[in-house]
């Protein structure tokens, strides 16, 4: 629990005791006391509507009740500096400045752990994201999903949730058959032999490179081999080549996974048919027109879904159900799937399947990643300058940088369409959101270096009561909100709230810096207090950027 949360608990308890004394209720009769942070700081640090909640019980006007509570509240002079009644009966609190200055040594001590909480303790989540087919490069939708999924996992971990990250490798089905046939054609081509390229084959430069690798590795060993033998070998090599490329690109993007789960393993370990039998035992399977159906309309889907077609082949839905059953059987309380915009219609049937398996539909959450459109100098960019083809994640990183790519993708809620301004992402001005935040961190680092050169080290024992300007306290207030913002972003599945917070923190720091001299050798005690203050801002900026997979540079 952080200092701000402790003070909120103290304040709530103090309000409860004031109500008991002023209104004559037993503690158990006092309704839940809600605290809000007013949008306008002129209305205090916190506000409560408890007087309005009590109006019916006390049979008095809310303002009259508030007037009886306030004298009791004013008896605590350690926490509360001022109390006022606003409007029809809101009670606004201005807390003593000490509650903020107490934050500084706490943040300095917790350092990289500042922002952590046990909010989500005891809940086990799995986040499955990206899960692109291993048949080509990651596109912009994958990149946005990777940034949001990884950031969300980081945020939820900091908020105390037990989180596992998973990539589902779609290594079964027709797309893999086409990959193997494409690799086979490029293998023959690399050996100077003619070969018909498959109609639905993959024509990317990576497949040409794969064909050359196969030719270099095997020579003409498989030219005259049977198709079954050759394709069986090439399947292994092709999947290793493509998944290796995906892993490398994601690692470069600072995205890692705890588990890479193979779809093929569902068949090898006999996980598919038992899932079907469980659905049958639960009474939701029926046969019609030679096909096997799941009655998803029992769970608000718009129509029933085919699991096994009349020719005996599986639809994509059946192994997907088996995979989700496998995840739940691994002990996860909640599954968070991050899907592309084209999968929106898939949500009702999958939630229906979860319920048909005997689980709560609330154990599956789906975050949809909406489309990304690139713009440069106001003009939409559809093709890569380098390749003349669709822009890939790798292209975007090379063009605007890794930090800007990660930060910009985290700036907007995942369910909103995004216009990615490449010109803005590359600019070195405060108009660029990531530059603005990183520059605040770099500026603090520069001041701390200058202080060190003059023999001034940051100390937890600095006299923080010497901080008394409005800008100093505004900065402290923002710093104190960090753990709550992290917890809120975790619960709302909203990494963009961290972006918004970092912008607010950078703004509070810049305002402080522009109105207060930090290094004042004629006033060393104040200087020491301000050095400690900006160090806490540096720590918090770094911790927030780290959640988003963005670096915190010490020089810019």
From Swiss-Prot:
Pfam families: Arg_tRNA_synt_N (PF03485), DALR_1 (PF05746), tRNA-synt_1d (PF00750). One of its GO terms (biological process) is arginyl-tRNA aminoacylation. HAMAP family: Arg_tRNA_synth. It is found in: Cytoplasm. Keywords: Aminoacyl-tRNA synthetase, ATP-binding, Cytoplasm, Ligase, Nucleotide-binding, Protein biosynthesis. It is an enzyme of class 6 (ligase). Its EC number is 6.1.1.19. One of its GO terms (cellular component) is cytoplasm. Monomer. This is Arginine--tRNA ligase. NCBIfam families: argS. It catalyses: tRNA(Arg) + L-arginine + ATP = L-arginyl-tRNA(Arg) + AMP + diphosphate. The lineage of its organism: Bacteria, Bacillati, Bacillota, Bacilli, Bacillales. Its main location: cytoplasm. One of its GO terms (molecular function) is ATP binding. Coiled coil: none annotated. It comes from the Bacteria.
């Amino acid at each position: 629990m952080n200092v701000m949360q402790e003070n909120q608990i103290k304040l709530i308890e103090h309000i409860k005791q004031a109500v008991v004394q002023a209104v004559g209720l037993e503690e158990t009769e006092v309704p839940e006391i809600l605290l809000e942070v007013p949008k306008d700081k002129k209305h205090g640090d916190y506000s409560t509507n408890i007087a309005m909640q009590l109006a019916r019980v006390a049979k008095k006007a809310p303002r009259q009740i508030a007037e009886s509570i306030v004298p009791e509240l004013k008896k605590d002079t350690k926490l509360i500096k001022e109390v006022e009644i606003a409007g029809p009966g809101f009670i606004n609190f201005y807390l003593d400045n000490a509650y903020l200055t107490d934050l500084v040594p706490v943040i300095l001590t917790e350092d990289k752990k500042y922002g952590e909480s046990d909010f989500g303790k005891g809940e086990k989540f799995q986040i499955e994201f990206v899960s692109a087919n291993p048949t080509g490069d990651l596109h912009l939708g994958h990149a946005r999903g990777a940034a949001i999924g990884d950031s969300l996992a980081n945020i939820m971990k900091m908020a105390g949730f037990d989180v596992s990250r998973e990539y589902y490798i779609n290594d079964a089905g027709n797309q893999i058959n086409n990959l193997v046939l494409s690799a086979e054609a490029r293998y023959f081509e690399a050996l100077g032999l003619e070969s018909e390229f498959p109609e639905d084959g993959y024509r990317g430069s990576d497949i040409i490179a794969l064909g050359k690798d196969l030719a270099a590795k095997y020579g003409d060993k498989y030219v005259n081999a049977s198709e079954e033998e050759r394709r069986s070998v090439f399947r292994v090599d092709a999947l290793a080549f493509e998944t290796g490329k995906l892993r490398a690109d994601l690692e470069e993007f600072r995205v890692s996974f705890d588990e890479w789960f193979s779809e093929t393993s569902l068949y090898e370990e006999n996980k598919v048919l038992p899932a079907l039998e469980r659905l049958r035992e639960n009474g939701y399977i029926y046969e019609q027109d030679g096909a096997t159906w799941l009655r998803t309309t029992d769970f608000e889907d718009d129509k029933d879904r085919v699991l096994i077609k009349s020719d005996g082949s599986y639809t994509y839905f059946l192994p997907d159900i088996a995979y989700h059953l496998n995840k739940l059987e691994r002990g996860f309380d909640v599954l968070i799937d991050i899907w592309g915009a084209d999968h929106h219609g898939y949500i009702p049937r999958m939630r229906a399947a979860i319920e048909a398996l005997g689980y709560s539909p609330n154990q599956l959450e789906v975050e949809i990643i909406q489309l990304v459109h690139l713009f440069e100098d106001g003009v939409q960019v559809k093709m890569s300058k380098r390749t003349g083809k669709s822009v890939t994640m790798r292209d975007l990183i090379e063009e605007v940088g890794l930090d800007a790519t990660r930060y910009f993708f985290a700036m907007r809620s995942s369910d909103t369409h995004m216009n990615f301004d490449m010109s803005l992402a590359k600019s070195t001005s405060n108009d660029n959101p990531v530059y603005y935040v990183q520059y605040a961190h770099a500026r603090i680092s520069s001041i701390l270096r200058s202080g060190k050169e003059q023999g001034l080290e940051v100390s937890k024992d600095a006299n923080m009561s010497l901080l008394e300007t409005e800008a100093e306290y505004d900065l402290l207030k923002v710093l104190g909100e960090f753990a709550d913002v992290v917890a809120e972003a975790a619960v709302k599945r909203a990494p963009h709230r961290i972006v918004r917070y970092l912008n607010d923190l950078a703004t509070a720091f810049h305002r402080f810096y522009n109105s207060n001299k930090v290094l004042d050798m004629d006033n060393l005690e104040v200087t020491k207090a301000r050095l400690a203050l900006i160090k806490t801002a540096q720590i918090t900026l770094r911790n927030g950027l780290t959640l988003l997979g963005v670096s915190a540079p010490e020089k810019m």
